[in-house]
Structures are given as structure tokens and as C-alpha cells.
Amino acid sequence: MILQRLFRLSSAVQSAISVSWRRNIGITAVAFNKELDPVQKLFVDKIREYRTKRQTSGGPVDAGPEYQQDLDRELFKLKQMYGKADMNTFPNFTFEDPKFEVVEKPQS
């Protein structure tokens, strides 16, 4: 009886470990594969270049003054339509509980 439980437990642990190993081996195989094809290498290089541009500019990349003017114009329209609130924050709602009248039940 004890041996059967032990074998069941060991098989469950063994299957969990094997699944974990398969996942880890799959991840590390991709991480250690430094040989990229030329298209993949260009794609990764462009992503890195974009990230550095975005960090240095602190905003949209390759956006001219037209973009900033359009953004300001659209934010102004939204403020006009929905009030003078800050558009970058979620609105704060306040709800009041309704007041109910207490109605006496007629006795029959």
C-alpha cells in the first residue's frame, strides 16, 4: 500500500520535472542560438535602434512639429467636448446613495 502511494507520487513528480525541463530547454535553446538569419538580424537591429531613439526623444519617434500641433488640437477639442479636465487621468466619479421613503404597510 505504501509502495503504491510512493510510486504514484514519484511518477507525478517525475512528469512535472520532465515538463519543466522541456520548457526550460526550449527557452534556452532559443536564447543561446546566436546565429540569426539576415532578415531576423535586421529586424532586431531596427527594434534596438527604435528603442534608443524613443528613449532619447522621450516621446514619439520621428514626429515632426505637425504631429505635435495635431495632438494639441485634438486634445483641445476633447477638453471642449468633455470639460476642462486633464485628459491623461481617469475621471473621478462621486455617487450619492438614493434616499428612500419609508412607507407604512396598511394593516388588514
From Swiss-Prot:
It is found in: Mitochondrion; Mitochondrion inner membrane. Residues 1-32 form a transit peptide. It comes from the Eukaryota. Its main location: mitochondrion. Keywords: Acetylation, CF(0), Hydrogen ion transport, Ion transport, Membrane, Mitochondrion, Mitochondrion inner membrane, Phosphoprotein, Transit peptide, Transport. Component of the ATP synthase complex composed at least of ATP5F1A/subunit alpha, ATP5F1B/subunit beta, ATP5MC1/subunit c (homooctomer), MT-ATP6/subunit a, MT-ATP8/subunit 8, ATP5ME/subunit e, ATP5MF/subunit f, ATP5MG/subunit g, ATP5MK/subunit k, ATP5MJ/subunit j, ATP5F1C/subunit gamma, ATP5F1D/subunit delta, ATP5F1E/subunit epsilon, ATP5PF/subunit F6, ATP5PB/subunit b, ATP5PD/subunit d, ATP5PO/subunit OSCP. One of its GO terms (cellular component) is mitochondrion. Gene3D superfamilies: Mitochondrial ATP synthase-coupling factor 6. The gene is ATP5PF. One of its GO terms (biological process) is proton motive force-driven ATP synthesis. It holds the Pfam family ATP-synt_F6. This is ATP synthase peripheral stalk subunit F6, mitochondrial. GO terms for molecular function: proton transmembrane transporter activity. It comes from Bos taurus (Bovine). The modification N6-succinyllysine is found at residues 84, 99.
